[in-house]
Amino acid sequence: MWKWLHPYAKPESAYQLSGKLLPWFSILALLCLSVGTVWGLAFAPSDYQQGDSFRIIYIHVPSAIWSMGVYMSMAIAAFIGLVWQIRLSDLAASAMAPIGAVYTFIALLTGAVWGKPMWGAWWVWDARLTAELILLFLYLGVIALYHAFDDQKTASKAAGILAIVGVANLPIIHFSVEWWNTLHQGATITKFEKPSISSDMLWPLLLNIFGFAFFFGAVTMVRFRNEIINNESHRPWVMKLAAAKSQRGN
């Protein structure tokens, strides 16, 4: 597998590969999110306890899941960049950070909207909510460090170390409802047990979970490609690419 991946450690090859994958990820994201959101908001049955207010689950759960998934992906990329000194991994981690921050903010916002009618408050210092808020601060810290130094290697090293250390927060988010007595409900979907919601509610939720994943992949590739161009602007292949685009524009 490494022999297959190794050629794509070169900026030009990575740029070309991401360009080929980007349309597919974009189409899949659009299809999954469109069908899943319309199905969940308009056609899924109401919850017998929460009524229609439960429908925010179709945004809240995918964003919460991928707020952690994006962070883990970012930390892995940062680890590869630190250990094997692969510059593209640092660029990938930098590209992921703002997307993860947005997902985390959406999870917190939708959680507050959902929590108001359920708990009677927009915010409570619940273990999972607090850990999710810390996750947002970690994302913002990583983003700040990437822009805090003029030297990109120093910036990537500092941001990468914070990203890796912050992984310790992910188990706290995931297992908080099991470790402590919290207001937050348990997992809707588990690996080894039957889901706690009906299939009519589950399928649109799964579509949106996949949709958020494909959207993350698509936006990451757009940002990653821009990072490559900015860092390789002096390379002949980038100049050739810019000249070709200029000719097509004329």
Where is each model-derived feature located?
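Polytopic transmembrane helical bundles with strong interfacial aromatic enrichment
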Residues: 1-250
